[in-house]
Amino acid sequence: MTEVRVGIVSWNTSALLDRCLGALSAALDGLDAEIVVVDNASGDDSATVAARHRGVHVVVNRTNEGYARAMNQALADTPAPVLIALNPDTEPPPSSLAKLVERVHERPGAGLVVPRLLNPDGTLQPSVQRFPSLPLALVSGFVPPRWQRGRLGQRWWLEPGAPHDRCEPVDWAIGAVHVLRAGALGGMPPYCERSLMYAEDLELCWRLHRTGWQVWLEADIEIPHVGNAAGQRAWGWQRRHRYWAASYDVVRAVRGSAHARAWAGVNLAATAVHLAANRVGSLTAGPAAARRRHEAAVLRSLLPVHGRVLATGVPRLEAQPPASGLR
């Protein structure tokens, strides 16, 4: 009997995909698993690389269908009670995925479990957050970092390491490694397809919470994750624009247009404050000043993103490929 379906979506990430697939057998530790790789019209040899791995079923899309739609393809039509949405820029250690599947069965209220993510250098990669809200935006945007410690930081998960150092329910988790209970989805596809990429993980976690399921962080299970391999290639630093557009769409759908516009107003003001601080810091010399100048350019580019939502509401998402050739 099939115990788990593993879905991976690749777009021009063949080298990372090869390492990820090479690690799967040991990571699944004997589980009866189906492995499906959906290639989103890559310009590299992702599909060929995937086909070299034994037991991997490869689906090749003629056009880039976006991450959510492609992952839904990968996880569809299976009797498996557990579904794993896995990014190709992860390299799961031996037994890691098997342990996460076991946690799904051990926690009857868990609709989704996720590991603690690590950067390639072994440092913590923050991956779980509070749901977007006006209080969180105010605290994170305007309270000085040195004051985001202790009880305040713990409450809003702003303090480094919190809550990544313990196993507990969380609000939402980025989608690098999602281990899902199929029965928690109510017959629906896992991911919302309104956006080409980004915030589908936020929408899924919100949906699970609203239907009575928990999202669990399993902090004692660690998986390395490069992060934004496809997004960086597609949009560069402008991926932040895509992220914010998709996030506003989800917040509007869940909390309403008025809340989304108010959230945009807080984000706009906070971005302006941070931009001013970065401009001051960029007046010095050295690498730190160069980083601040780059960050200032990014922040400046985000002002109209937040401003448009505040002024006219959340725009209709256009699932268009970027000019760099994502298609």
Positions of PLM-derived features:
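Conserved donor NDP-sugar-binding/catalytic core segment of glycosyltransferases
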Residues: 93-127
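Non-catalytic, C-terminal membrane-associated alpha-helical segments of glycosyltransferases
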Residues: 238-246, 257-327
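A short, conserved alpha-helix in the catalytic core of glycosyltransferases
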Residues: 163-166, 171-222
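Short aromatic/hydrophobic "clamp" motif used to bind/position activated sugar donors
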Residues: 83
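A conserved acidic beta->alpha catalytic loop
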Residues: 23, 39-47, 63, 93
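Glycine-rich, basic loop-to-helix element that forms the pyrophosphate-binding segment
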Residues: 60-78, 88
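Short, acidic, metal-binding catalytic loop of nucleotide-sugar glycosyltransferases
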Residues: 23-32
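Short, flexible, basic/aromatic active-site loop/helix in glycosyltransferases
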Residues: 132-170
